[in-house]
Amino acid sequence: MTEPTRQRWLILAHAFNMDGRAASQTITDKLPHLRRAGIEVVVLSGVSGTRDRVVEHHQLWPAGPAGLRFELRHVLRRRFENRVVYRILMTLASLVLLPGLILEKLLRPVESSWSWWLSAYVKGRALARQQPFDLIYSTGGAFAAHLAGRALKKATGTPWLAEVHDPLITPGNTPHTAQQKMQARVEGLICREADVAIWFTEQALASARARHPGLGERGKMLLPGIDPPFETLPPYQPGSKFIVGHFGSLSATRNLVPFIEALEALQLRRPDLVAATELHVTGGPLDAVSAAKIEQSPVRTCVRHLGRIEADPATGQSGREQILQRMRGVDVLLLLHGEEPICEEYIPSKLYEYLWMQRPILATVHRNPQMAAMLRGEGHVAVQTGGSGQDAGTASRELALALEQMYERWRSPGLPDSGHSSPYTTQAAVGCLLDWATPLVRRPA
């Protein structure tokens, strides 16, 4: 009896093997499970990440000058520690690319990675001629991956599965800029032509179906999750301070202001709580709104900005691994969802990491019942924002109340681990992916 031929998938992911990038982790975490399921994987990605040593991985430069300049910044920064050398090389590269940059800006004023689709198409077409693929799987992130997936489907007839990380159209917004119109066009292509199209929240899928009724049952919702980050959880050891930890990026619409205002309110009636509390902020730079608020706040001494955590060559730990260790060391994990319309259809990937830490989570959730239900279902606190009848201070008041309750538990009897494993795993996500992809694969009898 002849053994069935292994399925061969072409994965298109502009961000891949990039430490700390959610768009990268979403796909790289799936690969071990796909390989265990007998899938032969070939990956096409940009050049900013590290080359994979396990699967066939082709790193491709974009075709356009804006994309070339963007990728060069990452590659040169990684290769040259001397900032002077880096700046000289980038200046020279920018001068060489300048005419093309101006022309591209005039003709195609969209995200710099757009032209990567052409490089991915050309390489994917060449690989398919050598040995056909059973499935094209575009994932992102950058919409260039989906453009390449669609072009390869048309050229080869191979089934196409598209996985959309963040909504391509902001709720309540009519696309008017070149970038927004391009994203709307890409969503239309996905909804009309992908054999399976995946979104990461129920509302994002519902909105896409409302705009494109023809999507029907080809549209799916998938919670990407993450697998257990530790074989054995590092011990949680409370200290003399009540540590609240925020991990991840901040912005003008996802900032620390509600939490700082909660501390300010508590300062008036619970100065003992504020004196014992430290907010540890780990990630990139503070956004301008948070920085301005902290600078003039009477509780500014409670805030410690620890910055971005990079890979440690001494221990071999990636930035992500170090951050996961630090998450285990805090008393409470703070999750800020943001306050812009896209939050209604978006769940931050940080939530899945937090849920594995078994530490109490204090979260703000903006008009996203699915995310609030996930948190509360695991015993955590979700303070909803943006609801009807809520004023600007509602979230801060609710955060203050929740923080006070957590502080009292921390004092006595303590805030022990929950003991609950997260139900949202990459393994489960890949199981769904295989269920949806298997019927698409056409093999001769």
Task: Tell where the protein language model's regions lie, with residue ranges.
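Conserved donor-binding/catalytic core segment of Leloir-type glycosyltransferases
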Residues: 237-254, 260-263, 429
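Membrane-proximal helix-turn-helix segments that form the acceptor-binding/catalytic region
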Residues: 29, 107, 111, 118, ...
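Carbohydrate-associated surface elements
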Residues: 203, 224-225
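A conserved catalytic-core segment of Leloir-type glycosyltransferases
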Residues: 43-115
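Nucleotide-sugar-dependent
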Residues: 254, 310-328, 333-352, 362-373
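N-terminal subdomain of nucleotide-sugar transferases
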Residues: 1-70, 196, 202-205, 266, ...
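A short, active-site helix/loop in glycosyltransferases that binds the activated sugar's phosphate group
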Residues: 188-219, 372, 433
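Nucleotide-activated donor-binding/catalytic signature segment of Leloir-type glycosyltransferases, i.e.
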Residues: 276, 283-284, 288-325
